[in-house]
Amino acid sequence: MRPYVILNAAMTLDGKIATATGSSEISGEEDLRRVHELRRECDAIMVGINTVLADDPRLTVHRVDAAPGDNPVRVVVDSMARTPPHFRVLNDEAPTVIGVSESAPPERVAELRKRAEVVVAGTRRVDLHLLLERLHGMGIERLMLEGGSTLNYSMLTGGLVDEVRVCIAPMIVGGRDARTLVDGEGIDEMADAIRLELKRSYTLGEDLIVEYTVKG
């Protein structure tokens, strides 16, 4: 068993989630509120270590009305235990789970255990299937994925995403080195593409929101 997973992201019309320099201010204010409402509805929010290192995010509910107990559990996929101990994801605003691999340096793991629940899953890299199974065992039934390109790819190709919700902003940035919604090795044949079914689409301010379910 694993949690129900909703991949949520904001991208430009040309599919970029950040520029080549890392600038990622894409969503309008209305969409940011939508994101925080979704956070409030989920038991956990998952990001990868690259997102943590780039943004030092809080991963809490703070753009809509929320009680302290409304903050989801923060989950970081961090194979080598690189999360800096002073980063905000380890503050006391909400519980945090760090998923590491067996290859993570023991001294880093020990330091993280002082501030978070550490789950060892996988030998060299975090085994996402095993991590999600462990999270479900901890009572997490609904998880919001706010991953970067690499984590999104791994979760989607692993069959671990149930819904995809995307804010498409009326911007075009281009750039061969700019991050796309999903990267990774990619799929060779279009016939093997991950198929989605559109459930809803609507506008929020200038942004277009599309919501899909992932076909089995």
Swiss-Prot record:
InterPro entries to which the protein is assigned, alphabetical: DHFR-like_dom_sf (IPR024072), Rib_reduct_arc (IPR006401), RibD_C (IPR011549), RibDG_C (IPR002734), Riboflavin_Biosynth_HTPR (IPR050765)
Catalytic activity as recorded in UniProt: 2,5-diamino-6-(1-D-ribitylamino)pyrimidin-4(3H)-one 5'-phosphate + NADP(+) = 2,5-diamino-6-(1-D-ribosylamino)pyrimidin-4(3H)-one 5'-phosphate + NADPH + H(+); 2,5-diamino-6-(1-D-ribitylamino)pyrimidin-4(3H)-one 5'-phosphate + NAD(+) = 2,5-diamino-6-(1-D-ribosylamino)pyrimidin-4(3H)-one 5'-phosphate + NADH + H(+)
Pathway as given in its UniProt record: Cofactor biosynthesis; riboflavin biosynthesis
EC number: 1.1.1.302
A Pfam family of this chain: RibD_C
Top-level taxon in the UniProt lineage: Archaea
Entry annotated with the keyword Chaperone: no
GO biological process: riboflavin biosynthetic process
Keywords in alphabetical order: NADP, Oxidoreductase, Riboflavin biosynthesis
Function comment: Catalyzes an early step in riboflavin biosynthesis, the NADPH-dependent reduction of the ribose side chain of 2,5-diamino-6-ribosylamino-4(3H)-pyrimidinone 5'-phosphate, yielding 2,5-diamino-6-ribitylamino-4(3H)-pyrimidinone 5'-phosphate.
Family: Belongs to the HTP reductase family.
Protein name: 2,5-diamino-6-ribosylamino-4(3H)-pyrimidinone 5'-phosphate reductase
